[in-house]
Design a protein with these regions (language model features):
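Nucleotide/phosphate-binding catalytic cleft detector across ATP-hydrolyzing
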Residues: 1-12, 162
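Phosphate-binding glycine-rich/basic clefts of nucleotide- and phosphate-handling proteins
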Residues: 24-169
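Conserved catalytic-core segments centered on acid/base and nucleophilic motifs
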Residues: 9-26
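Short loop/turn elements that form and flank the Walker-type P-loop nucleotide-binding site
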Residues: 6, 18, 151
Length: 171
């Protein structure tokens, strides 16, 4: 006897930094696997080969976080941030900003510097994340229609790039 949902179409979306990988499972069998170069670096990267000076997220939050590090006497981390900023690679800056939420030194000082929460609280910034996910889902829908697949019953997201979903909702 088939398990519940075994006959439905399921889509697994693995979002990395540089690519998004999609697996379509239909009637319990893997039917289609594809990958495309539209992933987390699309949101947080340098785009069109510019540098971090043109990245809106870096520009908006670098001074805020630098000031938080200075105010809380976290000069070592401030120096690391300056070093990362000097390299002008947006993905490195963004990765560092995300890492601060779990940084041992920051936790030891009982300071909260949570870049993901800052983004979640930024109503304008959320639109970028929404558009990113809508673009991925739209691309998958067009692909599935072209290949003759039914609308999926479930869609799962995995990979480091999928963590930005938490900016939209913690559920």
């Amino acid at each position: 006897k088939a398990k519940k949902g075994a006959t439905s179409t399921v889509v697994s979306v693995d979002i990395g930094g540089g690519t998004t990988d999609v697996l379509i499972v239909d009637k319990g069998e893997p039917r289609y696997l594809t990958s495309f170069r539209f992933a987390a670096n699309t949101i947080f990267g340098d785009g069109y080969s510019y540098d971090s000076d043109s990245n809106g997220f870096v520009n908006k939050y670098k001074d805020i976080i630098t000031n938080q590090l200075e105010t809380n006497n976290l000069r070592g981390l401030k120096a690391v941030l300056k070093s990362v900023l000097d390299k002008r690679v947006s993905t490195d800056v963004i990765a560092f900003l995300f890492s601060l939420a779990s940084n041992k030194e920051i936790k030891k000082e009982k300071v909260e510097i949570n870049f993901a929460q800052m983004l979640a609280d930024d109503n304008r910034g959320k639109y970028v994340v929404i558009l990113f996910y809508v673009a991925i889902v739209y691309h998958i829908a067009k692909l599935m229609k072209a290949k003759g697949f039914d609308m999926p019953r479930h869609m799962t997201f995995s990979g480091n790039g999928s963590k930005v979903l938490n900016i939209l909702s913690t559920n």
